[in-house]
């Protein structure tokens, strides 16, 4: 099937008539970067014993006391600005455009100029969002989200293709997806959302950029300070098997830089997890019992090696996910060894080692207040909430269905009130973290079924009440029932996929309330997806 022609990327979130001309990217895998530097990097110490995770409820007291006494007032000093450092606004955002987007009240425009020394009385220095003409949107999960648009034709061109998560850009201008065909795709925010009034019909979304990796993509992430108004901050990092870490330009899709890691045999090793520091100065990468820290101002092989397991103590296994606290100078690491570790940002000193999951950790997320963080694991039906002030045991747990080794994402809204998670069964569940109270197992406030296939990715928009979901999973043929031995048909397949529901698609849902909260039959038939129960979803 021919891929629809991609519309231009609107970097500054302006209507399409003000967006710059698009840039094309050929669908070719980027060659592996060559390295000529003979210098070897330090290697982690050997050790195969599991981490010494104490069951004592006093585990983590050291960190708790440190946080109670107070933390350093300043974060690590950002390094010299490089390819990903913010700079002045792009010249493409003209002064005229900026002035058109801000309207002053009539009182301000008609007010005469004040002479020197005249007192200003009754003038409010701060304008409210209503005065500036902005609309404040909040997430509302009192009713089932309304389906807006999605992309499905893009992923059916290859057999057995499926999505592997989705992530909104920090500025909300576009969304990034990963799929089993080793292609990263960027979609613009649907142009219908820029129109005033309620838009009931949305066209199918088409990617504006495709970035092809050479092998299975392990992890991907946006630059933490990404803003479409500043093109030099619009970057995406990705890591794939037997390849260096690639930095892609989110405007053109071109490869802009590479970070390479080598083992003790000077062999290239791939990172299993990626995370930019909050100030954008560093890129943290997870390896086997090691975290390597690259400076974003110096692409190449130079990095700081932070070993997480030494002398048969510490956090063993592959570091599968990394997350930074938004308020404290520390970060959390999850490993496939079923352990969680907390480390200082400055030098990686260990603060606490936690255990409690039944499977390898696949995703971490900090609450915006910085006091709590959430963890999820593969083949584990629990999402655990941890309080940094009392790390002896989880604060509470949330139940979700995860029966495979696939990474099932979850996300928090910008206020931290709602937590949304996918599941192997396809159901999307929403919990109110503010109303959890002292309950050990809070129940979801809403649960709905976007499709029958696995919902592996969820991402909440940073400023609009938009929920993005990604679906699909790797499926294996099931044995067929044997028929009569006297049947003459001998070419019947021994394995069949007739009972498998393949629904690989990206979907956008409006979570701000509205008159119509059901998925239309026309969209259901066009996408080939299963209908939800109860007119668009099922309340819990």
UniProtKB/Swiss-Prot annotation:
Acidic residues compositional bias, start-end: 116-126
Record's GO cellular component terms: Cajal body; chromosome, telomeric region; site of double-strand break; telomerase holoenzyme complex
WD repeat positions: 158-197, 213-258, 263-304, 314-355, 356-396, 402-441
Source organism, top-level taxon: Eukaryota
Keyword DNA-binding (UniProt): no
InterPro entries: SWT21/TCAB1_mRNA_Telomere (IPR051150), WD40/YVTN_repeat-like_dom_sf (IPR015943), WD40_repeat_dom_sf (IPR036322), WD40_rpt (IPR001680)
Gene Ontology molecular function, alphabetical: RNA binding; telomerase RNA binding
Subcellular location: Nucleus, Cajal body; Chromosome, Telomere; Chromosome
Post-translational modifications reported in the UniProt record: Phosphorylated at Ser-64 by ATM in response to DNA damage, promoting its interaction with histone H2AX and localization to sites of DNA double-strand breaks.
Residues passing through the membrane, by range: none
GO BP term, example: positive regulation of DNA repair
Gly residues composition-biased segments: 531-540
Stretches the record annotates as Disordered: 1-126, 520-540
Stored Pfam families: WD40
Pro residues bias locations: 1-10
Entry keywords, A to Z: Chaperone, Chromosome, DNA damage, DNA repair, Nucleus, Phosphoprotein, Repeat, RNA-binding, Telomere, WD repeat
Modified positions (Phosphothreonine) in chain numbering: 480
List of residues that carry Phosphoserine: 26, 30, 54, 64, 85, 90, 482
Function: RNA chaperone that plays a key role in telomere maintenance and RNA localization to Cajal bodies. Specifically recognizes and binds the Cajal body box (CAB box) present in both small Cajal body RNAs (scaRNAs) and telomerase RNA template component (TERC). Essential component of the telomerase holoenzyme complex, a ribonucleoprotein complex essential for the replication of chromosome termini that elongates telomeres in most eukaryotes. In the telomerase holoenzyme complex, required to stimulate the catalytic activity of the complex.
Assembly and binders: Component of the telomerase holoenzyme complex composed of one molecule of TERT, one molecule of WRAP53/TCAB1, two molecules of H/ACA ribonucleoprotein complex subunits DKC1, NOP10, NHP2 and GAR1, and a telomerase RNA template component (TERC). The telomerase holoenzyme complex is associated with TEP1, SMG6/EST1A and POT1. Interacts with the chaperonin-containing T-complex (TRiC) complex; which mediates the folding of WRAP53/TCAB1. Interacts with COIL. Interacts with SMN1. Interacts with RNF8. Interacts with histone H2AX.
UniProt family annotation: Belongs to the TCAB1 family.
Protein name as it appears in the record: Telomerase Cajal body protein 1
Organism for this UniProt entry: Bos taurus
